[in-house]
């Protein structure tokens, strides 16, 4: 059974509480890059729907090997190590040990699950090896109900089935002694000039799904973070959790996050259409209304009428909740089915 988590980021306001109260999400993955841990923990304690079981802290240690200018609030978290090198990992430098101890010590007893710090992986090299080593160390020495290995993997690595099989073999060899294994998977997509940010080539997608499927067969619990509409496919594979946020960059992790760049642009109001299995600009819906039955595009969300009747009647926040609501409705339908064949049949019926 798959559950939807809110992928936390900047400008959270009341978005998380509202989504939880409306039963459109079942927990949160919190970002230490965007908010201090004490503030996050206070927020969890004040929010009735958040518990040690459904609240996850993403250490975002994968930023540690990049320029310190991109770390934002991470510098204030548990003596976060900046600009980590291979030598730091090889020699087990004091700053690494101090950080891991501070991070786990704070979470232990407060949270059921730990997202074990991991590095950003773009090849089968030292970053992958040390991600496995960190996970083993935490599993052997820390006390949590569930352990999730944080793996931020470049989408380029999913071009090769052989690379994926090698990664799976190494994971299996290094974790088969443990119970309660899990993976917190983030796909790091290349920056692209394609205006359709959901775009992904079929081979890459196929190998990502294969990777997740094989981990599930090995009894790993799976969280896939920063998902967009592809989260429906992960739900069909019975991933335990999928994470998705309120901005596009909280729904798709791209390589731009590891660069000091300013991104500007006019934000457009977009509606998540289940029948289209895509987003559509409200301006486009308005233009289509003259020669197409736009009711066929609706996802049966609470804001449908206001969104479709007048573009000015609906806010960006309304549409953020519309996305989670529609996604949650779809996931709930998938959860009620047993076989992948039934789930495929359901999906085809939604878009036919």
Regions found by a protein language model. Give the residues of each.
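Anion (oxyanion) recognition and catalysis
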Residues: 48-49, 216, 235
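Glycine-rich phosphate-binding active-site loops on the catalytic face of alpha/beta enzymes
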Residues: 27-36, 113-119, 229-232, 236-259
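Glycine/Thr-rich beta-alpha phosphate-binding loop at enzyme active sites
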Residues: 167-209, 236-237, 251-267
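C-terminal extensions of enzymes
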Residues: 295-352
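Active-site beta->alpha loop and helix N-cap motifs at the rims of alpha/beta catalytic domains
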Residues: 2-169, 180-181, 189
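C-terminal helical cap(s) of enzyme catalytic domains, especially alpha/beta-barrels
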Residues: 254-276, 343-352
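C-terminal amphipathic alpha-helical segment
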Residues: 262-306
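Glycine-rich adenosine-cofactor-binding loop
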Residues: 216-231
């Amino acid at each position: 059974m798959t559950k939807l988590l809110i992928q936390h980021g900047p400008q959270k306001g009341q978005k998380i509480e509202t989504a939880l109260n409306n039963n459109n999400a079942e927990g949160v993955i919190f970002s230490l890059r965007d908010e201090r841990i004490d503030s996050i923990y206070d927020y969890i304690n004040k929010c009735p729907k958040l518990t040690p079981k459904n609240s996850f802290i993403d250490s975002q240690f994968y930023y540690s090997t990049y320029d310190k200018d991109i770390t934002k609030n991470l510098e204030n978290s548990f003596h976060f190590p900046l600009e980590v090198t291979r030598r730091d990992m090889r020699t087990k430098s004091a700053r690494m040990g101090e950080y891991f101890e501070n991070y786990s010590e704070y979470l232990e007893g407060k949270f059921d699950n730990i997202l074990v710090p991991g590095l950003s992986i773009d090849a089968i090299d030292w970053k992958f090896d040390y991600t496995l080593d960190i996970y083993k160390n935490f599993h052997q020495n820390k006390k949590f109900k569930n352990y999730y290995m944080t793996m931020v993997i470049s989408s380029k690595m999913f071009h090769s089935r052989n690379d994926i099989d090698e990664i799976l073999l190494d994971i299996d060899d290094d974790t088969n002694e443990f119970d309660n294994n899990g993976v917190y998977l983030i796909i790091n997509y290349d920056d692209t000039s394609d205006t359709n940010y959901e775009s992904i080539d079929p081979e890459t997608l196929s190998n990502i799904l294969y990777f997740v499927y094989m981990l599930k067969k090995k009894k790993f619990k799976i969280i896939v973070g920063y998902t967009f509409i592809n989260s429906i496919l992960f739900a069909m594979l019975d991933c335990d959790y999928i994470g998705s946020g309120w901005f596009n960059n909280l729904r798709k992790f791209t390589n731009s996050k590891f660069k000091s760049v300013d991104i500007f642009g006019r934000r457009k109001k977009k509606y998540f259409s289940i029948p289209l299995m895509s987003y559509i600009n409200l301006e486009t819906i308005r233009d289509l209304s003259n020669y197409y039955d736009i009711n066929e595009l609706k996802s049966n969300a609470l804001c449908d009428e206001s969104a479709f009747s007048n573009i000015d009647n609906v806010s960006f926040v309304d549409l953020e909740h519309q996305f989670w609501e529609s996604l949650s409705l779809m996931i709930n339908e998938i959860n009620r089915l047993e076989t992948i064949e039934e789930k495929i049949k359901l999906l085809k019926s939604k878009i036919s």
